[in-house]
Each structure stands twice: as C-alpha cells, then as structure tokens.
Regions:
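Terminal appendage regions of diverse proteins
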Residues: 1-169
C-alpha cells in the first residue's frame, strides 16, 4: 500500500515536472484552470450575444409575429441562454426555434412570448414533442419554453421548420 501511494505521488510529481513544491504547483494549476473557465464562459456569453444580434437582424415576420429560426453548432446551455435573450429582445409576438448540432447530436430549443402562449394557445412542450419526431427524439417543457434531443442529426432543420408550421401563424 505504501509503495502504491508512493508510485501515485511520483506520477503526480511527474505531471508537474518533478517540482519540489507539489502543493504550490497544484494550487497554481487549479487557479489557472479556474481563470480559464471564467474566460471561456465570458467568450461563450459574447458569442451568444453576437449570435442573438445576427438572428434578430434576420428575423422573419409572419402575420405580425416575429419568427426566429436557425441551426447552430452550440451546446444546450448556450441554446437556452440564446432563446431567453431573444425573448427579452422580442417580448411580444415571438416564435423562436433553435436547432443545435453540438457533439453530432440534434437538440431543439423552442421559446414563445407569453402572449403567443396565452392568446394563441401555443404550448412549446406539446409542439416540441411533435417536431422532435423528425429527429427521432423526444422532449418537453413548459408552455413558453421546451427542449428536445434526438438521434437523427439530419432531421434538425426539418424539426425547426415543423415548430413554425405547428404554430399556425
């Protein structure tokens, strides 16, 4: 057991170039890692903001309703952040469907403004379950917001389009 612990300690020392101050090297590594994570989060937030601005500039209007759709190579958390930022920018008459293709897995994220839920009887959870079938998936959520995953990456664009179709604008 003592030899196993010593071997493990030697392996860790080797990872840190056999430094004499192993504790200090590990603390420095952890601090640098935390700093890099914060920088990545900041970069991702900036990317979401730029993407939001591009999508808003390209939003369609159908019968007075702003329709924002796209397929992007983003993570689920970024997709969620993005649609909520779009909803903040367009608080009324909004239908938004974002397809995500990160890690070669389709993810569909849908958000509606409250007036579309209340006055037009739209339910993102119900609509996304139907649209997700096109990507061999399933999901659900609340009346104003829902996410669905799937297996068929080729179906993500059709699923995004299906959301708009099912909204009956």
């Amino acid at each position: 057991l003592i030899y196993a612990v010593q071997d493990s300690l030697n392996d860790v020392r080797a990872l840190f170039n056999n430094t004499k101050d192993l504790h200090g090297a590990i603390e420095k590594f952890m601090s640098e890692n935390a700093t890099l994570k914060k920088e990545i989060e900041k970069f991702q937030a900036q990317m979401v903001e730029r993407t939001k601005e591009k999508l808003l500039a390209n939003a369609r209007e159908i019968n007075g309703v702003k329709v924002v759709t796209s397929v992007l190579p983003i993570e689920a958390a970024q997709a969620k952040d993005l649609v909520f930022k779009i909803r903040e920018a367009i608080p009324e008459k909004l239908v938004c469907a974002i397809g995500s293709t990160a890690h070669n897995k389709p993810l569909l994220t849908v958000i509606f403004s409250d007036d579309m839920v209340n006055n037009h009887n739209l339910n993102a959870g119900n609509i996304i379950r139907e649209a997700a079938k096109l990507m061999q998936g399933g999901g659900g959520g609340k009346p104003h917001y829902a996410q669905a995953g799937g297996k068929n990456l080729d179906g993500i664009s059709a699923a995004v389009d299906k959301v708009v179709e099912l909204a009956n604008l």
